[in-house]
């Protein structure tokens, strides 16, 4: 276990040589002076007692005995008495008359009370998985006090690899959805409750009507006005609750995917009356809530259901899980238009419900190992949620090891979800002092510079962002040089402490990754320097076990391998380099400004579709490359992107033609694409190799679209995208 023991001056109440009447002495000169008494011997109280026992021992060397169902006495710690001074998960710490009592308002209140005592009185900070700091002292004395605390939100969750450490999870006062939702049914549950694999063929009428026909599939939605669905779903829910008698909440919520709601005449009528597709959903959930009045039902307000209905109101036991997925993150939600659109939805739901679960995003799905400086908005957004009747909060953030300051972000969110009035900057500095030690001033300066540069640039921060988006802003060359100088100093400051050095090197990975991503977009760079940077990045990731680079679990080792193959010069000469493009069917309008150059500029696109790629949606591509003169053609390859989460699928086929006059073309060959359901982001080459070389000046490329997204895809029934960048003629 990694531990860091920091010797620091103790506050007077811990260092006093004698015990004042109002104090409780737990340990004196390393010898236990008190015992821990369980008011009730249950799992929560015993865990709280063991937590206190452990850290008192590690701080002082003295181990307090634990007594079940013992009597109150002088100099004892009583854990688990009930209190009505706090709400669920809340606690009271009362030190008076020679007794220290940690009282609970229910659930894990006793554990959280012990955590508060250890933090505020013993100086223990549990900062990440298996990592904590404490203040050694042979004497532990608790002053007179009476403190009552309740959480701002009754449910608090965030992603973090540290959550695998149960002590950390309790310390951050975090919960897991499986603790509350029956059968782990907490989001996107439609296909689990009414499986399209079971009912799709025999009852397509149960599923969304989109673009002229029913579209059953595991990402399709339900036809919520169909009278037969309700009883099937109600029966299924009844069986789930009976199998999980200790849980009384379930999610009945739309499958993932946008605009896939039913548009049959009956559903359309309800949607038009309610002013939102959410109308059908709330009506359906209300019926379930009436059928099971002692249960609680959660449903999503997400993408097409984000805005509330005009007329129907959720019943009290219907929970609205409201998601702000489409908002930008460079400023608080109140300060940009995407945020204000979400705020209108939040305020609308708050007018008709006091039972709101906010799902907030602080993640870059496409590049989790990239800078994402959103720390300055965390507090304001959480306060906003609280003001608008949110009682439950999930913060979806970059939580895997190696992602951008994952440990700091999880720590700050845990603290702010419990108490949004805490000072965010103080939290950041406290964490950094404990987790980065002597390197903390440099990393704090880095975060301040990065945030300032982001705001000064005016560039939005997006959940599908790329470092390349910011290469002229917060990641410009001069700033990257300054950031690296700070990290150099940070590494020097902790060079003798292997644990701290590991923390600093992991924190530097997003900067290293950004430099690699930016380097591949700039021609004429130093190949040897880039190779060295790539080796360093891969080595550090392997050394510390960094598992992935994006939401789709693309591995670091694959990234490094593909980078060498794809982005570093390999001697291949493209005879179509710089060719003029003649469009028969041009790309979507937003991609036309880059299209003339992007297909033959020698710069390959990365895993994020927003840079270098050229896209078509729901239609074919047809264009001609004018190479300027007759050239020998042996092989043609076009590069395609595969990214299912963005509706980017491989097309049906690509055909290549050759011509001498741009009028009469002869077919050279066709590449057919197999169906690919792999969720990984990848690059797919479409190559045709000729049996014998031909002479040609013009190369025509015709790509046949897949058409509509298939039944298994998020965009079922809607036009699919395909993206390509380089066309290479050899």
Regions found by a protein language model. Give the residues of each.
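Acidic, His- and aromatic-enriched active-site or binding-groove loops in soluble protein domains
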Residues: 270-288, 316-335, 415-422
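Short, well-ordered secondary-structure micro-motifs within conserved domains or adaptor modules
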Residues: 65-87
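Feature activates predominantly on carbohydrate-active enzymes
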Residues: 32-33, 43, 48-51, 55, ...
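Aromatic, loop-rich ligand-recognition surfaces of beta-strand-rich domains
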Residues: 605-669, 684-730
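Substrate-binding cleft/loops of secretory-pathway carbohydrate-active enzymes
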Residues: 298, 302-326, 369-374, 402-410
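Catalytic domains of carbohydrate-active enzymes that cleave complex glycans
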Residues: 416-597
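Structured mid-domain segments that build the active-site/substrate or prosthetic-cofactor binding neighborhood
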Residues: 228-229, 340-439, 445
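Bacterial Sec-dependent N-terminal signal peptides
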Residues: 1-25
């Amino acid at each position: 276990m990694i531990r860091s023991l920091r010797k620091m001056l103790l506050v007077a109440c811990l260092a006093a040589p004698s015990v004042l009447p109002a104090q409780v002495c737990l340990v004196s000169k390393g010898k236990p002076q008190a015992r821990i008494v369980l008011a009730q011997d249950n799992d929560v109280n015993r865990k709280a007692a063991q937590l206190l026992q452990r850290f008192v021992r590690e701080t002082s060397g003295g181990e307090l005995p634990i007594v079940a169902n013992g009597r109150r006495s002088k100099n004892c710690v009583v854990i688990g008495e009930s209190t009505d001074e706090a709400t669920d998960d809340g606690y009271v710490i009362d030190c008076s008359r020679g007794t220290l009592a940690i009282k609970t308002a229910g659930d894990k209140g006793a554990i959280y009370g012990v955590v508060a005592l250890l933090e505020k009185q013993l100086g223990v900070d549990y900062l990440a998985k298996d990592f904590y700091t404490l203040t050694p002292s042979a004497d532990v004395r608790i002053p007179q006090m009476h403190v009552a605390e309740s959480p701002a939100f009754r449910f608090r969750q965030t992603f973090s690899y540290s959550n695998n450490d149960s002590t950390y999870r309790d310390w951050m006062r975090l919960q897991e959805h499986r603790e509350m939702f029956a059968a782990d049914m907490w989001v996107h549950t439609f296909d689990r409750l009414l499986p399209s694999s079971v009912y799709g063929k025999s009852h397509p009428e149960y599923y969304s009507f989109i673009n002229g026909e029913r579209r059953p599939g595991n990402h399709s939605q339900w036809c919520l006005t169909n009278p037969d669905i309700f009883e099937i779903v109600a029966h299924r829910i009844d069986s789930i609750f009976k199998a999980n008698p200790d849980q009384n909440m379930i999610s009945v919520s739309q499958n993932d995917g946008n605009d896939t709601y039913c548009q049959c005449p009956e559903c359309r009528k309800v949607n038009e009356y309610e002013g939102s597709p959410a109308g059908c959903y709330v009506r359906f959930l209300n019926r379930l809530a009436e059928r099971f009045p002692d249960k609680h039902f959660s449903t999503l307000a997400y993408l097409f259901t984000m805005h509330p209905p005009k007329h129907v109101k959720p019943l009290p036991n219907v929970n609205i899980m409201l998601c702000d997925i489409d908002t930008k993150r460079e400023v608080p939600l109140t300060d940009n238009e995407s945020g204000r659109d979400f705020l209108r939805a939040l305020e609308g739901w708050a007018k008709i419900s006091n039972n709101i679960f906010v799902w907030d995003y602080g993640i870059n799905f496409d590049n989790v190992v990239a800078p994402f400086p959103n720390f300055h908005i965390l507090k304001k957004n959480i306060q906003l949620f609280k003001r608008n009747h949110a009682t439950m909060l999930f913060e979806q953030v970059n939580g895997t090891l190696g992602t951008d300051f994952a440990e700091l972000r999880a720590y700050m969110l845990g603290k702010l979800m419990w108490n949004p009035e805490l000072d965010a900057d103080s939290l950041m500095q406290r964490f950094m002092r404990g987790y980065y030690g002597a390197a903390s001033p440099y990393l704090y300066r880095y975060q301040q510079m990065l945030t300032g540069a982001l705001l000064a640039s005016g560039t939005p921060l997006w959940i599908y962002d790329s470092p390349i988006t910011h290469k002229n802003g917060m990641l410009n060359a001069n700033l990257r040089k300054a950031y690296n100088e700070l990290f150099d100093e940070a590494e020097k400051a902790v060079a003798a402490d292997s644990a701290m050095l590991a923390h600093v090197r992991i924190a530097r990975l997003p900067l290293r990754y950004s430099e690699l991503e930016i380097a591949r977009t700039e021609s004429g760079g130093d190949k040897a320097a880039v190779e060295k940077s790539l080796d360093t990045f891969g080595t550090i990731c392997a050394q510390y076990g960094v598992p992935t680079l994006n939401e789709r679990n693309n591995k670091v080792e694959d990234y490094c391998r593909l980078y060498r193959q794809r982005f570093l010069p390999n001697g291949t000469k493209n005879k179509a380099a710089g060719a003029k493009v003649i469009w028969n069917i041009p790309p979507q309008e937003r991609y036309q400004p880059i299209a003339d150059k992007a297909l033959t500029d020698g710069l390959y696109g990365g895993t994020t579709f927003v840079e270098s790629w050229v896209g078509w949606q729901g239609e074919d591509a047809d264009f001609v490359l004018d190479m300027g003169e007759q050239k020998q053609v042996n092989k043609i390859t076009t590069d395609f992107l595969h990214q299912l989460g963005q509706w980017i699928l491989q097309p049906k086929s690509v055909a290549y033609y050759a011509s001498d006059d741009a009028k009469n073309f002869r077919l050279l060959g066709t590449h057919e694409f197999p169906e690919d359901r792999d969720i990984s982001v990848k690059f797919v080459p479409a190559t045709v190799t000729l049996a014998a070389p031909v002479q040609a000046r013009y190369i025509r490329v015709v790509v046949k679209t897949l058409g509509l997204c298939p039944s298994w895809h998020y965009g079922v029934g809607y036009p699919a995208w395909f993206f390509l960048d380089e066309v290479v003629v050899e």
